[in-house]
Amino acid sequence: MLTHLRPALVLLTALTAITGLAYPLAMTGLAGAIFPARAAGSLIERDGRIVGSALIGQSFSQAHYFHGRPSVTTATDPADAGKTVPAPYNAANSMGSNLGPTSAVLAERVKGDLAALSAENPGAPVPVDLVTTSGSGLDPDIAPEAALFQVPRVARARGMPEDRLRALVTAQVEGRTFGVLGERRVNVLALNLAVDELARR
């Protein structure tokens, strides 16, 4: 019986070492050598400190910043570990809301967001990105139309001409991946950092 078990155990050990240790370590080393910034998490640094990642959205609620998509991520309630509380852009608990199209809770949230956005920019159609969440709750990007919709609010809050901000948004637009995958997009963190830089000039 041992003669039958020995080859199986040797194969199990060899495959575990190859697929569980050698391959992941080789890929990590290769990624670090070829794409060092991406392998480190695509971190964005300003003035010697890390301000975020280009891959994970952040919560911006101030009027002088562009806002990302709504996030419905949660965190454990400090008062009751059996419950959760809203914690937008909580990277430790990436998820969507799981609310379906017939959900009254979802309908009320969208209506509230639509009303607030319509009051902010009357007469302009509200882009869908600004009222819908992403599957992860951590989407760092919005459509160019969603960024342009917010230009009047940011311009008023910063005392800047709208045309300068529109030009900045246009300059921040990233094309489709490989020219065919996904949609054109604007990274909200990168855009807000560019707005801060423009305001300092």
Swiss-Prot record:
It comes from the Bacteria. One of its GO terms (molecular function) is ATP binding. Keywords: ATP-binding, Cell inner membrane, Cell membrane, Ion transport, Membrane, Nucleotide-binding, Potassium, Potassium transport, Transmembrane, Transmembrane helix, Transport. The chain crosses the membrane at residues 7-29. InterPro entries: KdpC. It holds the Pfam family KdpC. It is found in: Cell inner membrane. It is a single-pass membrane protein. GO terms for cellular component: plasma membrane. Signal peptide: none annotated. Belongs to the KdpC family. The system is composed of three essential subunits: KdpA, KdpB and KdpC. HAMAP family: KdpC. Part of the high-affinity ATP-driven potassium transport (or Kdp) system, which catalyzes the hydrolysis of ATP coupled with the electrogenic transport of potassium into the cytoplasm. This subunit acts as a catalytic chaperone that increases the ATP-binding affinity of the ATP-hydrolyzing subunit KdpB by the formation of a transient KdpB/KdpC/ATP ternary complex. This is Potassium-transporting ATPase KdpC subunit. The lineage of its organism: Bacteria, Pseudomonadati, Pseudomonadota, Alphaproteobacteria, Hyphomicrobiales.
